[in-house]
Amino acid sequence: MKEVILNQEQMDLLKDHAVKCGSNESCAMLLGIHNEQQWNVKEVFLTRNADGDSEITFTIPPEELLYGYQLADEKHLELVGIFHSHPNSIAVPSNTDKKFMKLNGDIPWIIFSGINTDFKAYILDEDIEEIPIKIKERHFFQ
């Protein structure tokens, strides 16, 4: 079964980032390990939103995007997810999200709703498919 795996500390970090951004969309790169059915997040790289004070769009600044990929490479990880928030709506991909999901291939998008304070994950297969988020226990000796 397809799933995104995060620990509670990572979920809290993403939620705090979204809350700090208030009514503007927040964004982050999720780095980790991917096999055919699982995207296992090992590191969260919080980014700024280059769209500034936008409630409805996000763009990761090019220099932060590049740094995120370099960080993944240094740690022998890969991009396993793109996170952003919908401060004033539910956690469902917008038409803009769907367009950019097509450009990002087999990478889940994790969306946080500022209304419901919940997370949902989506992958583009033949169509947009919601996939479960599994919360794992954090082991300090991984």
Residue ranges and their predicted role:
Residues 85:
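Short, well-ordered beta-to-alpha junction loops that form the rim of enzyme active sites
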Residues 1-79, 88-142:
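Conserved beta-strand-loop surface patch within small alpha/beta domains used
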